[in-house]
Amino acid sequence: MSMSTPQKAILPPFNADILPLGLYVAATVLLIGILLLAAWWLGDKKRSAAKEIAYESGVIPTGTARLAYPVPFYLVAIFFIVFDVEAVFIFTWAVAWDELGFPGLIHITAFIIVLLLGLVWLWLKGGLEWGPSKQVRRSKFEVRS
């Protein structure tokens, strides 16, 4: 008789609760693969100049399709993201008010003060002024020639 030591399982025990999720993911990947393969197989393979231009609701495009957006549009997008993230932090703090208590109030107050100081600095630098009425401000330390 030989004595053998029991082998440890390499894989964790099967959890039947994740079986529907696994089947859903497998079916989704299979369906996407079939649809992509069908589109590639059934699609027209001929290239032409008409197929290479962008569709503009039936109007033949003129010039380049790439338009440069003015920088203020990017600034508005960045301001939106910054203040949206700020709102997420403040909302999270408000939801957890019971657990955070007075120290949480001090932290969120410091957070809001830092953001308001940044907003005031941006306003004083002219970052919020754009359009036809925008004027270039000179720093009082700037040397004029």
Swiss-Prot record:
One of its GO terms (molecular function) is NADH:ubiquinone reductase (non-electrogenic) activity. It is found in: Cell inner membrane. Keywords: Cell inner membrane, Cell membrane, Membrane, NAD, Quinone, Translocase, Transmembrane, Transmembrane helix, Transport, Ubiquinone. Its EC number is 7.1.1.-. It is an enzyme of class 7 (translocase). It comes from the Bacteria. The keyword rRNA-binding does not apply. It is a multi-pass membrane protein. It catalyses: a quinone + NADH + 5 H(+)(in) = a quinol + NAD(+) + 4 H(+)(out). The chain crosses the membrane at residues 18-38, 71-91, 104-124. One of its GO terms (cellular component) is plasma membrane. Belongs to the complex I subunit 3 family. NDH-1 is composed of 14 different subunits. Subunits NuoA, H, J, K, L, M, N constitute the membrane sector of the complex. NDH-1 shuttles electrons from NADH, via FMN and iron-sulfur (Fe-S) centers, to quinones in the respiratory chain. The immediate electron acceptor for the enzyme in this species is believed to be ubiquinone. Couples the redox reaction to proton translocation (for every two electrons transferred, four hydrogen ions are translocated across the cytoplasmic membrane), and thus conserves the redox energy in a proton gradient. This is NADH-quinone oxidoreductase subunit A 1.
